[in-house]
């Protein structure tokens, strides 16, 4: 059981990081774009997609950073969770969103997490000898 805990925590930290980063990025995007309540302009839609992708990439990086070993497997677990959440969101689309918006989130979440995880997994592990 003790061997599972660090892996579980790595994915949990990434998941929490995703929501925190998404909250921050979407609020910054809303402050910049200043959407009209109840509508999704093209600029607001693009800023939401960018915020989602950046949050997923940051979460993937955090998961890889916290993973005790096999970092990309942990990131893959996070990407799977993000895909499931986005698919669940497809069942109840928000009014005013383009029809393709939920499908874009299904793709952007896992891809962003995998990209961020790849970048995070390339870092040198603490205590490892320098690469030649």
Model regions: which residues?
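Juxtamembrane/disordered regions of integral membrane proteins
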Residues: 1-132
């Amino acid at each position: 059981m003790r061997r599972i805990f660090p892996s579980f925590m790595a994915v949990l930290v990434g998941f929490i990081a995703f929501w925190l980063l998404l909250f921050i990025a979407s609020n910054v995007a809303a402050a910049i774009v200043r959407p009209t309540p109840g509508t999704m302009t093209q600029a607001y839609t693009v800023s939401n997609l960018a915020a989602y992708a950046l949050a997923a990439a940051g979460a993937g990086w955090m998961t890889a950073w916290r993973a005790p070993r096999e970092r990309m497997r942990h990131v893959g677990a996070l990407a799977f969770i993000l895909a499931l959440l986005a698919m669940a969101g497809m069942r109840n689309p928000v009014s005013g969103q383009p029809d393709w918006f939920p499908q874009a989130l299904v793709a952007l979440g896992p891809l962003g997490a995998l990209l961020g995880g790849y970048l995070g997994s390339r870092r040198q592990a603490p205590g490892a000898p320098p690469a030649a």
